[in-house]
A protein has these predicted regions:
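Secretory targeting and sorting signals
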Residues: 2-28
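Active-site region of glycoside hydrolase catalytic domains
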Residues: 31-67, 113, 122-330, 337-439
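Acidic/polar N-terminal loop/beta-strand segments that form early-domain functional surfaces
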Residues: 47-49, 103-107
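Short catalytic helix/loop segments, enriched in acidic residues and glycine
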Residues: 61-82
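Internal amphipathic alpha-helical repeat/solenoid segments
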Residues: 81-87, 111, 120
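Catalytic domains of carbohydrate-active enzymes, especially glycoside hydrolases
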Residues: 84-105
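Glycine-rich, proline-tolerant flexible connector loops at the mouths of alpha/beta enzymes
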Residues: 106-116
């Protein structure tokens, strides 16, 4: 791994703001007056993870982190997808999307070493069957930062036997579900996985490079196995794009797995402005609703990866907007406007030749955001701490996404509610040298 911490990456980003403040941007490339839709074969999806949404959590590293951390919200049963999967999948079906991302919790299907749970697998059998019956394709995440408590007792990713333990379980998952023709995400956001393990005490800081090497080994091995069980499979490991510092943050991991990616999985959420550069790390940790939204940043993010992986399919595996307990954002952005603006820039990217094949909204419902119920990302909002019924209440983005999925994009003459950022710090040098603008 290239030596890097969140502080290092964000310090570089802050430095970039100083340099670019004096930069003179090039003239924006011509913008088409209207844009075609993204096509009938485009993947419109919603996303969730097991631990964050299922509830009824078995013993795991994250169950332990939550139970022992004094500042984390109590988990309870989260939004109880475990008992409400059928109605939640129906909500996704009614949006008109065609892809549903879930996670298979290792701790649920293998509660003890060498022993798999028939009950655990039966739950996921029902979930995947319901997704397919609703006319959607599953996207299965094998590892979304959670592993069994017995594996934590062995040292987690510091354990030399971790990769073989991991592969034994993941092969069982692949054997069971390859016939459902899912898309696959092997490991969710490897860099964030590393950071969370260190800050929660699951990994000594000295073992970060070891964990990254083991994550890469695990990805590369299960990639090959998936292709033996599901010829033509689409497999990735999604990366969380870090504005202005992505080559440093994610470059090392991508170098290790680049040969075994059928599509590039990308998570994009925030822009980066000079006003918040110095506080970016603190906001990202516990006040993410204060981070700036920058819908046009998704265009520069896609262009960054299109240049890094020429011709490779690009899929936005996660994108969304946080609020603080559902309150209006200080910047006035609504969930519907942010979604429509983002999709406009997806269409611009496709029109400019980028091989964009899919987009997942994070998330279908609010969920447990790794220690807190305060950040709300859901198309459907849920007041976990005040509403025992866990009522799913639609936000304004539900109707917006339904129209987008139906039309495969925003209308041809749509104009974003916010102009593109001059010399965007999302991809600083490129956005100054080759910026994009709006028609007129």
């Amino acid at each position: 791994m290239r030596a890097c911490t969140r502080r290092h990456a964000l310090a570089l980003a802050a430095a970039a703001t100083v340099v670019l403040a004096a930069a003179a941007p090039a003239q924006a490339r011509p913008a088409p007056e209207s844009l075609p839709g993204l096509g009938a074969d485009f993947h419109w999806g919603v996303a969730a993870s097991g631990f964050q949404s299922e509830g009824h959590a078995p013993d795991s590293n994250w169950r332990r982190y939550v139970d022992t951390h004094p500042d984390y919200d109590r988990y309870g049963d989260s939004v109880d997808f475990y008992d409400r999967y059928a109605s939640d999948i129906a909500l996704a079906r009614d949006l008109g999307v065609n892809t549903y991302r879930i996670g298979i919790e290792w701790a649920r299907v293998q509660p003890r070493p060498g022993e798999w749970s028939a009950e655990g697998f039966a739950f996921y059998d029902k979930v995947i069957a319901a997704i397919r019956a609703a006319g959607m394709r599953p996207m299965i995440t094998l590892d979304h930062w959670v592993y069994p408590g017995w594996e934590a007792d062995r040292g987690g990713w510091a354990n030399p036997g971790m990769v073989e333990d991991w592969l034994a379980n993941m092969r069982a998952v692949v054997d069971r579900y390859a016939g459902a023709d899912p898309m696959w995400v092997t490991i969710n956001e490897p860099f964030a996985y590393l950071l969370n393990e260190v800050r929660n005490g699951g990994l000594p800081a000295a073992e970060v490079t070891t964990m990254q090497a083991r994550l890469a080994q695990a990805h590369n091995s299960i990639y090959d196995y998936i292709h033996t069980r599901q010829p033509g499979a689409m497999v990735t490991s999604n990366v969380a794009y870090i504005p202005a510092a992505d080559p440093i943050v994610n470059g090392g991991m991508l170098d290790l797995i680049a040969a075994k990616l059928d599509y590039v999985g990308i998570d994009y959420y925030y822009g980066l402005s000079p006003e918040v550069a110095a506080q970016y790390g603190a906001f990202a940790d516990n006040r993410m609703w204060q981070l700036p939204l920058q819908a046009d940043g998704i265009y520069y993010t896609l262009r960054h990866f299109a240049d890094r992986f020429p011709g490779k399919p690009l899929y936005i595996v996660e994108n969304g907007m946080p609020t603080q307990n559902g309150a209006p954002r200080a910047d006035g952005y609504t969930r519907a406007d942010d979604l429509r603006d983002t999709v406009y820039w997806l269409q611009r990217a496709k029109a400019d030749g980028m091989n964009v094949i899919g987009y997942n909204y994070w998330s279908l419902t609010d969920n447990y955001e790794w220690g807190s119920y305060t950040p709300r990302f859901g198309l459907y909002t849920i007041d976990v701490e005040a509403d025992p019924a866990l009522t799913r209440r639609p936000t304004d983005a539900v109707d917006a996404y339904r129209a987008i999925a139906h039309d495969s994009g925003v209308p041809a003459g749509y104009r974003p509610t916010r102009p593109p950022t001059t010399c965007s710090l999302v991809d600083a040098l490129d956005s100054c040298a080759d910026p994009v603008g709006l028609p007129g």
